[in-house]
Amino acid sequence: MEARNSEQRLFTRLVADAASCTLCPAMCDRSAVLSSLNGTLAARVMFIGEAPGRKGADRTHVPFSGDQSGKNFDRFLASISLAREDIFITSAALCNPRTDSGANRKPTKTEVANCSHFLRRALEIINPKVVVTLGSVALDALKTIHWHDLNLKESAARIYVWHDRLLVPIYHPSPQVLASHRREAAQLQDYQLVAQAIEQAGLYQAA
């Protein structure tokens, strides 16, 4: 119980620090998507995305919710009987990056670097046995915490040992990725590998 209370105190501090961060001038008016809505601190599986979407998590404050990427993500989780209640979800950049016209954009390397200490602290607090990166930005973000030489195109849908954990790099569930880089059938197969990693880590049975 004392350990759990310590984790909660550390997480509460992390949330407060992320909320008050002003390192990225282009995102100072955005809210960091990091709270109890990201998942349970007891999670042994952590999913890391790119950044909150304008119509999704930036609006709902729940990672991968409120937009088509979130719907796709929920469908893929359900395919291996994995519930949000069992996992923790965060992202390489905690705030929503936008273009001058207001559209979503990828976070810059500087923005990801600015957020890297939040990601590192989240990993330390939750201490997951399995880390699943969703897309190349998330995979590259891990390099700032513990070096790896993986790239998504060559390393997707394989299980690696990274930083004393199992790492599964897979593609992002966005409609654009599904239409151009990784079709639904392939992504569903990728999630079967996530289930395999979960079983390999001795956590719980995924269907």
Where are these regions (language model features)?
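A polyanion-binding, active-site-adjacent surface
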Residues: E2-E154, Y160-Q205
